[in-house]
Amino acid sequence: MLPFKTLALFLLTAVAEIVGCYLPWLWLRQGRSAWLLVPAAASLALFAWLLTLHPAATGRVYAAYGGVYVAVALVWLWTVDGVRPGPWDWLGVSVTLCGMAIIAFAPRGG
């Protein structure tokens, strides 16, 4: 799979997972409507389906996806929660994304 397509799929997958977890959090912690569980379930189903679109071995996909998830969660923290990440947050996500790139795009023998 091409690197751009892989990254786009990882980004979409991360957003689906975060939305699927954030909506129940709103219901449980902020007293929002239980109807939020309906789009949350749909979002988590989309998340699971998106994971199946990656051609690599499942464990490798999960490991590489985890790096993108960390980056998207940090952006979510900033844009949705209104908490600006600090320099250590950005350094941590940079290291994580380097690891993701190695796992996802390193040449594989055989």
Curated annotation (Swiss-Prot):
UniProt keyword terms in alphabetical order: Cell inner membrane, Cell membrane, Membrane, Transmembrane, Transmembrane helix
Transmembrane stretches, start-end: 7-27, 33-53, 63-83, 86-106
GO CC terms of this entry: plasma membrane
SUPFAM superfamilies (UniProt xref): Multidrug resistance efflux transporter EmrE
Subcellular location: Cell inner membrane
InterPro entries: UPF0060
Membrane association type: Multi-pass membrane protein
Pfam families documented for this protein: UPF0060 (PF02694)
Coiled coil region boundaries: none
Top-level taxonomic group: Bacteria
NCBIfam families: PRK02237.1
Family the UniProt entry places it in: Belongs to the UPF0060 family.
Protein name from the UniProt record: UPF0060 membrane protein Dtpsy_1668
